[in-house]
Amino acid sequence: MDRGARANIRAVLTGETRSRWALVLGASSGFGEACSIALAKAGWNVFGVHLDRKSTQPNADRIVAEIAAAGRKAEFFNVNAADDAKRSEVVAAISRSCSGDSPECRVSVMLHSLAFGTLKPFFGEPRENAISKQQLEMTIDVMGNSLVYWTQDLFFAGLLAPGARIFAMTSAGDHIVWPAYGAVSAAKAVLEAHVRQLAVELAPHRVSVNALRAGVTDTPALRKIPGNEQMIERVQAMHPAGRLTTPADVAGALVALCADGAAWVSGNVIGVDGGEDIAGGR
């Protein structure tokens, strides 16, 4: 057992981590799922926000059970993370939970991993197949602007811990063109701009903000992109390591960036792709 693992076990046994909470937006699948479980194993309790129908709710329940099995607490909210009223309700619930925990209870890690948007070309035939103004604005708001809204609400509610780490999931679509990905690509560019601005404005509070650019990963979100099977085949053929990125790869990187020694890493887009991007793209 390495020194870090022993230190974490000591912290759990002595109660040092009892007030450490992470907030994961998009907690029930893909990157959000993997990061929720990894953070729990590293000593964080988890607030999870997800949007699931009855058919997919069992997976969210399984994640909660895995967090509990790691000896951590989990509070999951099945709501639309992009809805202003629902966001306020979740923040209020977090505040109530923290008030009953300890005076030190704050959110010390936040992950923005929302993958809800419109995948349509700008110029479709017929015109009805082209993306609309409403769809474009919705995609950018959900996948980009909501990072700011959630961070603001936590900050002004006094729930963002000094020294907190904020992460946002981006993709190579921020600089590579994929069919029907234009709105999401725009949202990722907006998201990365917000990461830079938040990093500067929150620096006096010792809060770091970074975007994680994952390589092509076989997630439910990827499966919605037109041509995803061909994309997977191309990446597997050209990747220097011969495989796709996995959610576990991203979760491991996120937990590593939560270490004390990584506090000075802020305002960056960090590639978590095993060299995929530099090896020739997609």
What do the predicted segments below correspond to?
Residues 2-10, 255, 266-282:
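Short C-terminal tail/terminal secondary-structure segment
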Residues 2-109, 116-134, 224:
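Short-chain dehydrogenase/reductase
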Residues 59-61, 180-183, 204, 211, ...:
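A glycine/serine/threonine-rich, flexible loop-to-helix segment
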Residues 86-89, 138-141, 145-153, 196, ...:
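Conserved mid-core alpha-helix of short-chain dehydrogenase/reductase
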Residues 115-204, 216-217, 278:
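Catalytic loop of short-chain dehydrogenase/reductase
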Residues 203, 208, 265-267:
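Short, small/polar-rich loop/turn modules that mediate ligand/substrate recognition or access, typified
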Residues 208-218, 258, 271-273:
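Conserved SDR Rossmann-fold cofactor-binding beta-strand/turn motif
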Residues 239-250, 261:
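A conserved structural motif in NAD(P)-dependent oxidoreductases
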